[in-house]
Design a protein with these regions (language model features):
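Cys-dependent protein tyrosine phosphatase-like superfamily
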Residues: 1-79, 92-181
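Ser/Thr-glycine-rich phosphate-binding loops at phosphate-binding pockets of nucleotides
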Residues: 84, 88-89
Length: 181
């Protein structure tokens, strides 16, 4: 992703750039499922929902580093984003806003703005790089599913947090280890 679409940063910002890599191999998992099943939007949406859970569960070290950066900024602005700024950035925004006690419906509304602000081409560009084998069959339905956000995707992450950790605050303090800071 970074090599394909590098950020256009000033030298000052390039010195301060930090890469925190997160991936759920979403498109690859869709392609593999399509080999065993039919091209199915409902299934692809389930893959997206699972990806949002994987962002939280498989990358706790990245989230810990992310929050250390936010905490250490001491009031200075921090810019965080992913290639399309909808899935991984959506999870990051959900975590930050939840810790700041932003109302859930406001978090949801902000998240859903991705559908209005991104073209589907921008939204899927990040996923194309996850394919390990160029002969995999990526369908238009996969790409259209990847190019949109649905509240069910974010809700899958929220439900995981509520069921497994009770709250974002508990995830932050106990799972990410900020209760000792």
């Amino acid at each position: 992703e970074i090599k394909k679409s590098p950020d256009n940063l000033s030298p000052f910002l390039k010195e301060r750039y930090i890469n925190l890599s997160i991936s759920a191999q979403t498109l690859s998992r869709m392609v593999n499922a399509c080999k065993d099943n039919k091209d199915d939007a409902i299934y692809y949406e389930k893959v997206m929902e699972e990806s949002y859970k994987l962002y939280l569960e498989n990358h706790k070290n990245v989230w810990k580093d992310f929050f250390k950066i936010l905490i250490s900024s001491k009031g200075h602005p921090i810019l965080f984003h992913c290639t399309a700024g909808k899935d991984r950035t959506g999870i990051a925004s959900y975590l930050v806003q939840s810790l700041c006690d932003v109302e859930e419906n406001s978090i949801d509304e902000s998240y859903l703005l991705s559908n209005d602000l991104l073209s589907s081409k921008e939204a899927v560009s990040e996923q194309q790089d996850t394919l390990k084998n160029p002969d995999k069959n990526v369908t238009p339905l996969m790409l259209s599913t990847l190019g949109r956000v649905k509240i069910s995707y974010l809700n899958s992450a929220k439900n995981l947090v509520k069921e497994k950790y009770q709250s974002v605050k508990s995830y932050f303090l106990n799972e990410l280890g900020f209760n000792n800071h």
